[in-house]
Amino acid sequence: HTVIDIGGQDVKVLQIDNGVMTNFVMNDKCAAGTGRFLDVMARVLEVKVEDLGTLGSQSTKYVGISSTCTVFAESEVISQLSMETNKCDIINGIHHSVANRVAGLAHRVGVRDQVVMTGGVAQNIGIVNALQEQLGHTIHTSPLTQYNGALGAALFAHQKYLKEQKG
């Protein structure tokens, strides 16, 4: 399985074989491709971050956002707005920019047939769709995907507790 976890501060891609992590890569050096990146873009566009997915899906094309740096991407978005570019097209471009960044990380560990996406960003259908397009794989998410990490930690702790009780 391939697990893609996009949170507020970092992006992680894991390769899982028979329940064991066999490969891992993480982008934690900058905000590009993270929930924080989307927060900044939503603020510049004057929309709610939770509306980005819906708005991006109303686009007929996407405006290329070439900068991976949040600060430079913010400047690109401001420039597009000053040219009166359709906000939905800009948002679609943002989704593709994030997907391109995440796909680059995913290709470093190798993408398997079963792809699962977790973290709050997985609630953004625009990013999920753009990433599916980039990877050529269906991406599975859950409605409460932002809690997957906490649930996994709780299960791990419970299993450890049970083992310790057996002595």
Task: Label the predicted regions.
Residues I4-G8, V25-G33, I91-H95, V116-V121, ...:
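Active-site nucleophile and cofactor-binding loops and adjacent substrate-binding regions
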